[in-house]
Amino acid sequence: MEEKQVMTNTQLEAALRGHRSAGTVFRLLTYAFGLGTILLFAAELTPVAVVTLVLTFVFGYQMSKHGEALKKLLGDNIVSGALNDVFENVEYKPFGCLPSKSIEDAGMVFPFEYSGVRGSDYVKGTYKGLNVELSDVELYNVSSHYDEETQQWKDEETQVFKGQWLVCDFGKELSGQVHLSANAKALRRQHRDDSVEMENAAFNGRFLVTAASAQEAYYLLTPHMMEYILSAAGKAGGEVYMAFLRGGRLHVAVKTGRDFFELGRSKADVDRLRQKFLGELHWFTGIMDELRLADTLYRKETGV
């Protein structure tokens, strides 16, 4: 069994900087040689183009390896500790993702269509007795078009969502099935029949609420809950989508445009990174804490 390397903060920070710098260099080389390969083939300089093509693959491989090494360092030395501080029974897979079926089952009301799912940083655990799953998610749509020049059909992939996705199982039937979406004119036109106007102008301005029954939306989204969601959305760093499913699950998706546990352009400071990751995790746990206190969340048992 592979042992995790124990590193001091100074050593870890140096290793993180090294892999990030190397990854950046190889990414630039990959793009440059890739462009050069295209131009050389266009100029019919085939022998040279073949050489640059091989180098493009070599540089791309090195870029990928440094990216994987960076992710593993973060996961082993910072992310795992932050997750264990927040959740219990943690299972963390840096290169795993939420099952596509789970995402589809949410029935999230998006202003776009998607045909594929991928992601990373899959987390599974429990939070105060609730079963939780969380991961980076990327949704993309593949469309086909005919290339007149090559006289072939080509697939074109477009990213429509990139961000974080939480699934929390409350273990009880909820009092309704309600979806919240970032407000968009196109969505309002599509959902004239099942949209619900709430008694909060600011909330209506930010979210489109859809439900089979307006009463269920009013029951779940109390005035206090709407104020909390508005406040949380203001700190989310992207569009917020939510799905309260009658079976007991809550889905929260935030379109941040980035991965969760990443170094990015941040300074490679271990303590700051740890606090950053904890802060992002607490954004999600704050929503769960707030909902657990809501008397109107669960379906009331009726006597026989």
Where are the model-predicted features located?
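Cytosolic juxtamembrane N-terminal segments of multi-pass membrane proteins
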Residues: 1-23, 82
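Loop-to-transmembrane boundary segments
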Residues: 17-29, 108, 113
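Canonical alpha-helical transmembrane segments of integral membrane proteins
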Residues: 24-43
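Generic L/I/V-rich hydrophobic alpha-helical segments across diverse proteins
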Residues: 26, 33, 52, 56-59
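Hydrophobic alpha-helical transmembrane segments
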Residues: 38-55
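Transmembrane-cytosolic junction motif
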Residues: 57-82
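Charged, low-complexity intrinsically disordered regions
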Residues: 80, 84-86, 94-145, 149-304
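Conserved oxyanion/phosphate-binding beta-strand-loop segments in alpha/beta enzyme cores
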Residues: 89
